[in-house]
Regions:
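Short internal beta-strands
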Residues: 103-110, 129-139
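A short secondary-structure junction signal
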Residues: 142-144, 183-188, 199-204, 208-214
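Divalent metal-coordination and catalytic microenvironments
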Residues: 70, 109, 190, 202, ...
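Long, non-catalytic terminal segments
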Residues: 2-54, 384-397
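Metallo-beta-lactamase
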Residues: 36-37, 135-188, 193
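Cap/insert and terminal regions of metallo-dependent hydrolase folds
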Residues: 82-83, 94-104, 110-125, 208, ...
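Conserved beta-strand hairpin/beta-sheet module of binuclear metal-dependent hydrolase folds
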Residues: 35-91, 186-189, 197-200
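Beta-sheet entry/capping signal
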Residues: 76-77, 104, 130, 196-197, ...
């Protein structure tokens, strides 16, 4: 297998055009970077698999979200679409010219709104493509039919219930359905037999110590969180980028990291009013964070230079706290699919070297270690889970 090729950005000094990166539907899910979605396109496996990556997050806590584009005999399959800006569509048209039409669009999760929202617009851009969705789709606060959410009724199919796309080339394996109370978690993994590549959505991630290349297009989130106070400037150097990335990882996994304090309001406002800080890029100097000693060690525990896959902490504690058995069984089923070479999740790093042995080892580790703990860095997530159980929003222990 040829090693993955280096990143090839679609945006740069000469091509970074805001009008080509506009996403008009962002108010339906108002996440950073709002209406402007820069996209990085990387060829992960030569002439076989491509990654379309965009940033997405809250308060500059932004991590990559990925659409995988897989070349099949019939054309191209889009797995977990991202916002189809003009920049994204231009890149897809270029792939179509070389490898055939976009014939299949897959929404591989029932609950991930960030993956669900782009699908109708992507489907309209490729009117000949069949749209496949997981069973148990749901919306909140009202349960609406998919057609009311913009999915094309005449060419939308339900995975497993109405067949499987490209079953002669791909294997499909569901995790779930798992009862979340408000709705259902169901994710379907896809194995490309030819390349040994396993496409996933949210269940597993691999987090590298270095910031993803996507931040080269806009390092602002890294630089914002690399600071200690709001009156400090946004300095761009490798060390600031690494420090900002480690803090972003803590936020994204634990929501409120344990070694983090919120300074008094008057202190935050005093720093915000300092000269030189009154710009939108720095949120006008508002920086309500104070990091305590030990945060680096907690960040390092989430990262792996060898890209070992893991369950994201926020999913383990809020989605899977009472579903360890189902997750472990799914990992063992994935390991039995065949010869595995690469793992491509919809977030963080990709491609990740993988094997059946590595997945079985991860399953063993999850069975043996403490699961969804309550203390230390998990304390805030644990409080959220207990509150949701007490309110009857999510099911409690059985």
């Amino acid at each position: 297998m040829t090693d993955p090729t280096p990143p090839l950005p679609t945006a740069g000094p000469d091509t970074d055009r805001p009008e080509r990166q506009h996403w008009p539907w962002w108010p339906l899910l108002p996440l950073y970077p709002y209406g402007r979605r820069r996209t990085l396109v990387r060829e992960l496996l030569p002439d076989r698999l491509w990654s379309f990556e965009q940033l997405q997050g809250v308060w500059y806590v932004a991590v990559p979200i990925r659409m995988s584009v897989l070349r099949l005999r019939e054309g191209l399959m889009l797995y977990a679409p991202v916002a189809p800006t003009a920049e994204v569509l231009d890149a897809l048209r270029g792939l179509e010219q070389r490898h055939g039409p976009v014939c299949t669009i897959v929404l591989p999760t029932s609950s991930g709104l960030e993956h669900k929202l782009p699908v109708p617009a992507m489907a309209r851009a490729f009117p000949e493509a069949t749209v496949w969705v997981t069973p148990k789709q749901w919306s909140f606060p009202l349960r609406l039919p998919l057609a009311w959410l913009g999915f094309p009724a005449r060419r939308t199919r339900v995975l497993l219930e109405e067949g499987l796309p490209h079953a002669d080339q791909l294997d499909w394996l569901p995790l779930g359905p798992l009862d979340l109370g408000l709705g259902t978690f169901l994710e379907i993994a896809c194995l490309d037999r030819s390349s040994g590549t396993l496409l996933l959505t949210d269940a597993l991630v691999a987090i590298a110590p270095e910031p993803p290349a996507l931040f080269d297009l806009d390092p602002t989130p890294l630089l914002f969180h690399a600071r200690e106070r709001g009156d400090e400037p946004l300095l761009d150097d490798p060390e600031c980028r690494r420090r900002g990335w480690r803090r972003l990882v803590l936020f994204a996994n634990y929501l409120r990291p344990e070694p983090l304090d919120v300074p008094p309001l008057m202190e935050v406002l005093r720093h915000a009013l300092a000269p030189g800080c009154r710009s939108p890029r720095s949120h006008f100097g508002l920086y309500p964070f104070r990091w305590r000693a030990g945060w680096e060690q907690q960040a390092d525990a989430l990262m792996a230079a060898d890209l070992s896959p893991r369950v994201a902490a926020v999913l383990e504690r809020l989605v899977f706290p009472r579903q360890r058995h189902a997750l472990v069984a799914w990992l063992r089923q994935l390991a039995a699919l065949g010869e595995l070479r690469w793992l491509v999740p919809a977030h963080y790093e990709a491609p990740v070297p993988i094997s059946s042995h590595r997945l079985c080892r991860l399953a063993d580790e999850l069975e043996e270690r403490a699961w969804a703990p309550d203390g230390g860095p998990w304390e805030f997530l644990s409080r959220i889970d207990r509150a949701l159980v007490d309110l009857g929003v999510v099911p409690g222990p059985r």
